[in-house]
Amino acid sequence: MKSKRIFDLCASLLLILMVSPVLIGVAIIISLSGHPPIYRSKRIGLNGCMFNCYKFTSMKDISTLPIEIQNNILKELHAKGHMKNDPRVTKFGKWIRKTSIDELPQLFNVLFGNMSLVGPRPISQYEADKYGKKIEYYKKSTPGITGIWQVSGRDEVKYKRRVAM
């Protein structure tokens, strides 16, 4: 086992133990709001292997919104890939996103070996299709909870710049 993997394994286990009260509390709050506490999304990992990336649920299901709003959301997501003030984000979801608490379940991804503590952000197949030939560089790394994108301004970094990172 490589030293980075040993570090990731030990550090993620220790961090999970340290933040377990927060993990449990957030899971309970989300469950009480009627949503499943954990959101899973398919992401591309090392060597192009797909894995379930875990996050705390921070949005309501789009089908719970009026059809006009659903259509507007889908148009903007298709055009831009994201929304600045997404109406699906819950009040509690906005707070856990702002504080990055929504990403704490990714410590389990690190524990399971799908992710590392430090590496490029895990991306979806939709995003990978935009990478072009650069996707081959991405596939050579284990995705991480934190990396250069987060410390370089996070959401303020333009998408093309993020791909280059």
Where in the sequence are the language-model features?
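A hydrophobic, helix-centered structural microdomain
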Residues: 1-63
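Alpha-helical membrane-protein architecture signal
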Residues: 3-7, 53, 85-89, 104, ...
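Short, glycine-rich, amphipathic interfacial segments at transmembrane boundaries or analogous
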Residues: 39-88, 146-164
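Short acidic-aromatic low-complexity motifs
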Residues: 96-106
